Amino acid sequence: MSVVIRLARAGTKKRPVYHVVVADSRFPRDGRFIERLGYFNPLMPKDNEARLKLDMEKVKGWLAKGAQPSDRVARFLDAAGVKKREARQNPIKAVPRKERKAQAEAAAKG
């Protein structure tokens, strides 16, 4: 059973509130879950303490059991200092070729 810590949408139309839940990865986004760990209200100001509420003891327990956080939950945990978020792959899109690099250096010198 692959267990994830993720957000489940709640609230009304155009007024979302998200529950932070532990669920099997095969369950629907807003469907069955194992345990509710907290909530996230994106409509509140960013500096408001009630914007994100997590039970850190339960979160640490589930991480110790091997639960994988979703991307957004990983950001929350990184901000809280619970788990360091891995850097994402950022490939270098356009590396100049050698001759263009040499031309750019020559133009910069004089």
From Swiss-Prot:
Family the entry assigns: Belongs to the bacterial ribosomal protein bS16 family.
Organism name: Bradyrhizobium sp. (strain BTAi1 / ATCC BAA-1182)
GO-annotated biological processes: translation
Protein name per UniProt: Small ribosomal subunit protein bS16
Chain segments carrying region Disordered: 87-110
A GO CC annotation given for this chain: small ribosomal subunit
Pfam families documented for this protein: Ribosomal_S16
Molecular functions per Gene Ontology: structural constituent of ribosome
Keyword Calcium recorded: no
Keywords, comma-separated and alphabetical: Ribonucleoprotein, Ribosomal protein
